[in-house]
């Protein structure tokens, strides 16, 4: 049954993304910025809803009150979530009250229809093989987008980690936060419970998203700041999904 539901969900994504992306690409000729962003987020909301309706993937979010309110549209924050699956890539723009600017590898732009649409959005796509140029672009574009009220989102581990595992936390998000004096918000997410990495077989269940309090970055050392972010995320992951982690011992 899971295989059938997952296949139906994949078909649902394919059938809906093609017309939505074509509309978005056409629309982008005339309109960019926030209106373009929210048009594309409409499909991400549909994708998140489809995972629930077809595959039984539910979610619960706590800590939204830790984020700036809609009345404070230009209060910039930098989001630093745990990265376990494709789910948070789809869901976070649908869950957050302000436009998000993802930092992502440029290869995603090559995905037909989906990549064409995100290429028209105010995001930061980088060549991970050119680290110096990539960081310069993140710093430059991050400043610009946060000044416009966007929230930059960077996955500190850089790539998806399997359930119960801890990836190597990179300091890029902390460096950007320190450079711009922007608070960094750690986020724990248990998406691998339902949507494991490198898999399109979705399991019914509940994904927990826990948003931490913003951590001030001004005047901090980026390595020390990232250790604090990592410590909060990993401790919260153990609290939310204890069966995925060893009962005793250190780093999983």
Question: Where do the language-model regions lie?
Answer:
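A short, well-structured juxtamembrane/interface segment
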Residues: 50-76, 246
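Active-site phosphate/pyrophosphate- and oxyanion-stabilizing loops and adjacent acidic/basic residues
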Residues: 48-49, 90, 174-175
């Amino acid at each position: 049954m899971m295989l059938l539901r997952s296949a139906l969900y994949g078909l649902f994504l394919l059938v809906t993304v093609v017309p939505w992306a074509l509309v978005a690409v056409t629309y982008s000729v005339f309109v960019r910025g926030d209106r373009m962003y929210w048009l594309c987020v409409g499909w991400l909301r549909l994708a998140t809803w489809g995972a629930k309706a077809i595959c039984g993937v539910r979610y619960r979010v706590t800590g939204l009150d830790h984020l700036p309110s809609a009345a404070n549209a230009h209060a910039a924050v930098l989001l630093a979530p745990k990265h376990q699956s494709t789910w948070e890539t789809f869901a976070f723009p649908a869950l957050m009250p302000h436009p998000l600017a993802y930092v992502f590898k440029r290869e995603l732009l090559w995905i037909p229809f989906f990549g064409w649409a995100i290429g028209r959005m105010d995001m930061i796509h980088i060549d991970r093989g050119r680290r110096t140029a990539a960081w310069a672009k993140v710093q430059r574009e991050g400043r610009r987008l946060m000044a416009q009220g966007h929230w930059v989102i960077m996955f500190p581990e850089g790539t998806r980690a399997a359930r119960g595992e801890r990836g190597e936390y990179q300091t890029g998000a902390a460096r950007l936060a320190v450079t711009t004096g922007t608070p960094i918000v750690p986020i724990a997410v248990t998406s691998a419970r339902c949507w494991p990495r490198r898999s399109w077989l979705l399991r019914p269940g509940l994904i927990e998203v826990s948003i931490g309090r913003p951590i001030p970055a001004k005047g901090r050392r980026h390595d020390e700041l990232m250790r604090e972010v990592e410590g909060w995320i990993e401790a919260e992951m153990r609290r939310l999904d204890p069966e995925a982690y060893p009962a005793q011992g250190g780093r999983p």
